[in-house]
């Protein structure tokens, strides 16, 4: 009976496969189109006369002699030193993730193992702060940062990003710790471990997929941030996202859209690599956080 119920008809297979393929095309098309257009000139990629120019590169052939050109990448990475923004982003993201996970694992473990009612209300308070718009929180830091001459530095930006991200890491890691039986802690301490040693050598290895998943979400928050980095960083310490916005120009300054297109592709590609590399940990981590063990 079960084999009959699990047997899929050819029509169902075709329908499900077609749906998955359609979804993949819709999801991947914006990035693939931007990737293709990043090797064209602006007259082709943003052509109003014929959108097919973006495919055949009519203006690109006229201006550069070939269907493809790397002028956008050269202008962004070399002429405008986008590599400096990439390094700044790497530094800020790295320390934001490390600090967030350090405090998040310790705090989430303490709240999960605490039997007091205040743990719930602390998590609710953290959720309130997490729900607030980032721009609301950042504006409160501007005056003291200017007064204490701390504005423009990467260190202060890391502190603000950690403060904004910490409620999320607390909630997520707290749910992972709740799924780990307290018997593991007690068994480790019976064997001679202190509470911290049990946490470090027993609990963390068990819930490592959850730590990786939370770290990736923290990474994405800091990597994609615009409001905090645009308002708190000086020009020389600027990260990728605000600099991409700068490539688009302003009311008083003309930008170069193709520099922005090339920079967008450069900033997006590492995210695909990261997700593919950690996909197994992400799936197992999300599953562990969703199911009460």
Write out the residue ranges for each language-model feature.
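A structural signal for multi-pass alpha-helical bundles of membrane permease subunits
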Residues: 4-7, 12-293
